[in-house]
Amino acid sequence: MRIAIALFNLGGPDGPDAVEPFLFNLFSDPAIIRVPGFLRRFLARTISRRRAPKARGIYARIGGGSPLLPNTLAQARALEERLRDLGEVRAFPVMRYWHPMTPEAVREIAQFAPDRIVLLPLYPQFSTTTTASSLDAWREEAARAGLAAPMRTLCCYPVEAGFIEALAALVRDGVEAARAKGRPRILFSAHGLPEKVVKAGDPYQWQVEQTAAAAMQRLGDIGADHVVCYQSRVGPLKWIGPDRKSVV
C-alpha cells in the first residue's frame, strides 16, 4: 500500500531575496488579514515592504534563511523510517507561504499516486489562521488536481502525551541550566492572535494554555513559576496577552 503523509507547516524564506515575497504571501492570506481582497493585497504589500529589512537582519543571524524546511524534511524522513512496516510511506512537506507550497506539494503527491493520504498539520494547537488555512488551501488544490485517494486528517494535539513529554524535557533542561544564574522563571511564549479572532471562536489560546498546564504538570515540583505569553504582534488591533515584551 502506498501512503502519502502531507506535513503542513508555515514555511519560511530560504534566503534574503525570499523574505519580502514570503511576508507578502503571509499577509495576503484572508485568514490572517480579514478585509476585502483588494485592500488586503494593498496592506500585504505595504506591510511586507516595511518589515522585510528588519526581518532580513533577523534571518541573517541564523544563516540568511529559515531552518523550517530542513527541519521539516528531517521530520519527514524520520516519520518514513518509523512507519516503513506499513508499506510504501512517503512524507511530503506542504508549506503555506513559501516553497514547497500547496500546489507544488499536491502535484508531487499526485505523481506518487498514493492509495491513502494522511493530512498532518505540524501545529499542535488548532487555529483558523494556521491549521484551517492550510487545510482549506489543500482541499482547493487537491480538488483541482483530482486527487481521489481517501484522506484522513490528524488535527491538533495540544496535550498529546509524547508531545508534552518532549516539551517538558526541553523545559527541564533549560531550567536546570538557568539555576546557575538565579531562580528561573518559565515563559511559554506562543505566536499571538488578534483578540477578535479568539472571541469569534478560535480555540488557539485555550489550547496553548492547555499545553502549558500539561507541561507544568509533567514537570512536577520543579521550583520555578511560569507564565504564558504571546509574541509577534502586528498592526493596530488589540491582541491576546500578556505580550512577551511586557513580561520580559
Outline where the language-model segments fall.
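Active-site-proximal alpha-helix that buttresses catalytic centers in soluble enzyme cores
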Residues: 1-248
